[in-house]
UniProtKB/Swiss-Prot annotation:
Annotated protein name in UniProt: Doublesex- and mab-3-related transcription factor 1
Lineage, uppermost ranks: Eukaryota, Metazoa, Chordata, Craniata, Vertebrata
Gene for this chain: DMRT1
Residue numbers bearing the Phosphoserine modification: S338
Disordered, as annotated region: 1-72, 148-179, 316-373
Keyword Cell membrane: no
Localization terms from the record: Nucleus
């Protein structure tokens, strides 16, 4: 029978079927294919069912609350306690075992890194430091060969306003030439903040740090912000001189009226100079202001450059020579009354009375003689 023949060869669907029995062969082939399909479908269904079960478990875990952090010190000692509100009450808070020491060291390193990132961000905003790409080894070798003839890169003999570029990042500090001193000394190789193995993106400018420790090229402006070292009396002179110019008086007359009590000049100009030298900083003669320095922008135009502390005449001597004869003893009174902090009109009245007091002694005698006659 063709059906028996078909059942006897269920696993030969590739062979040429017999002529009389193509439909039964097709049935058998279809049955075997159906069996294979059911078995394959079962396998695929099992795998898909397993996958759907796994996905269902992951979805259920996602629906749960997020994992709470556990205390690392308690975990080192075999306990699992949530970290929230547990820091003060941890039993192993002061533990000095090997694992807990490792945790403390890691915390210190992370805190230092956070502080370093914050400081670098602040310096980048202020423009103090800027990113510098680190050169390769071949470029460093070429730079060292080029700079071999000139060992002193930045000396005090250079008078340009813009400083020369800093030395390469990995080069050692060079030796100074005999005619000038080095401005950059003992600057770290890559950066001033460590992390040699992982070089940071921001490398601080070497001239920024050298300006703190080394003297500048111009000795008069020897501090960081280039403020000239004026004494208090000259600052008071400049402010009162501006007021005097607004009122219409000369700067020399009005500058002495607004001075506070410690700076009122005495009988001679020597005391004025002594008080000036006491109040200003201990600056040697090379820091003295000369006439070729430009006046600072925040001072008024009434401050003359000709009058220096040591060279020029004092203001009290100039006023005494103008307002009274040099032989009279009223020069101290005139200078003191002119420097008193009162209004312009009353000062002028006092000066007129004092200047007129001396010649008024001459015309008194004829009046008395006429009355006696």
């Amino acid at each position: 029978m063709p059906n028996d023949d078909a059942y006897s060869k269920p696993s030969a669907p590739s062979e040429a079927p017999h002529a009389p029995g193509p439909p039964p062969q097709g049935k058998a082939g279809g049955f075997s294919k159906a069996l294979l399909g059911t078995s394959g479908g079962g396998g695929s269904g099992g795998s898909s069912g397993g996958g759907s079960g796994a996905s269902g478990m992951s979805a259920a875990s996602n629906k749960k609350s997020p994992r709470l952090p556990k205390c690392a010190r308690c975990r080192n000692h075999g306990y699992a306690s949530p970290l929230k509100g547990h820091k003060r009450f941890c039993m192993w808070r002061d533990c000095q075992c090997k694992k807990c020491n490792l945790i403390a060291e890691r915390q210190r390193v992370m805190a230092a890194q956070v502080a370093l990132r914050r400081q670098q961000a602040q310096e980048e905003e202020l423009g103090i430091s800027h990113p510098i790409p680190l050169p390769s080894a071949a470029e460093l070798l070429v730079k060292r060969e080029n700079h071999g003839s000139n060992p002193c890169l930045m000396t005090e003999s250079s008078s340009s306003s813009q400083p020369p570029p800093p030395p390469p990042a990995a080069s050692t500090p060079t030796t100074a030439a005999p005619e000038g001193r080095m401005v950059i000394q003992d600057i770290p190789a890559v950066t001033s903040r460590g992390h040699v193995e992982n070089a940071p993106d921001l490398v601080s400018d070497s001239t920024y740090y050298s300006s703190f420790y080394q003297p500048s090229l111009f000795p008069y402006y020897n501090n960081l912000y280039n403020y000239p070292q004026y004494s208090m009396a000259l600052a008071a002179d400049s402010s009162s001189g501006d007021v005097g110019n607004a009122l219409g008086g000369s700067p020399v007359k009005n500058s002495l009226r607004g001075l506070p009590a410690p700076y009122v000049p005495g009988q001679t100009g020597n005391q004025w100079q002594m008080k000036n030298s006491e109040t200003r900083h201990a600056v040697s003669s090379q820091y003295r202001m000369h006439s070729y320095y430009p006046p600072p922008s925040y001072l008024g135009q009434s401050v003359s450059q000709i009058f220096t502390f040591e060279d020029g005449p004092s203001y009290s001597e100039a006023k005494a020579s103008v307002l009274s004869p040099p032989s009279s003893q009223d020069s101290g009174l005139v200078s003191l009354s002119s420097s008193s902090p009162i209004s312009n009109e009353s000062t002028k009245g006092v000066l007129e009375c004092e200047s007129a007091s001396e010649p008024s002694s001459f015309p008194v005698t004829p009046v008395i003689e006429e009355r006696t006659k």
